[in-house]
Amino acid sequence: MDVRDQKSVDAGIRRIVDRFGKIDIVVNNAGISGVTPVDAADTDAWLDIVQTNVVGTYYVTRAATPHLPNGGRVIMISSVLGKFGVPGYTAYCTAKTGLIGFTRSLALELAPRKITVNAICPGWTDTEMARDGMRDIAAAAGISVEQFKKEAMSRVPLGEMVDPSEVAALVAFLCAPTGDKITGQALSICAGSTQA
C-alpha cells in the first residue's frame, strides 16, 4: 500500500481485516528522509517527506484503530531527530517531531480502550536509509563516508550504530503484556546520542 494515498491505505487495511478479522498491533514504520535545507529545499521533496512520514502515519492509524481490540498497540517509528534539530534536515526533523506529538495525543484518545500508543526514536541505525544519509552528508561536507561515520560515531557515547534487530526487540517489548502500562512515550534507542 502507498501510505501517502488514503484510498490505498483504506483498501490495504480492509484486506488485512478481511483476512485476519482484526488488527492487534499497528507499527507505523514507513518513512523517507532527505537533505532539505530551507534556503535550498525543493518544496515538493520537503512536502513528500512530511506527507509520507506524518500524513501516511495518520492515514494508517486512522484506518486501523477501529479494528484494534481493547488492549491493542500502536507504535510510531520516529527518530531522535524528532527530539533535536539537525541542519539541512528540516523536513525530516519536522515530520519526526510531529510523530511524537501525534503519539502523545493519540495515547490519550485511545486510553479508554486500554490501547497503548508509543513512539520509538532510533538514532543512527544500520539501515539503507541511514547509509544513504551518511553518503549525502559526507558528499556535502567534501569528506569520505568512512570519515563522516567515524566523526558521527565519535559523538555517540556508545560509539556505534543501532542494529535494526534492537529496534525490533523494543517494538516486541512494547507489544508484550509487560508493555501494557507504557503509553504516550517517545523512547530513544540511540546508543546515548540523546538523553531526552
Give the role of each language-model region.
Residues 36-39, 84-90, 112-113, 159, ...:
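Active-site loop immediately N-terminal to the catalytic Tyr-X3-Lys motif
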Residues 37-38, 42-50, 152:
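Substrate-binding pocket helix/loop in short-chain dehydrogenase/reductase
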Residues 41, 85-93, 105, 133:
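Active-site loop-to-helix junction immediately N-terminal to the catalytic Tyr of the SDR YXXXK motif
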Residues 61, 95, 103:
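Active-site helix of classical SDR
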Residues 79:
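Residue(s) in the substrate-gating loop at a strand-loop-helix junction
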Residues 84, 160, 172, 183-196:
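Short C-terminal tail/terminal secondary-structure segment
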Residues 111, 116, 182-184:
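Short, small/polar-rich loop/turn modules that mediate ligand/substrate recognition or access, typified
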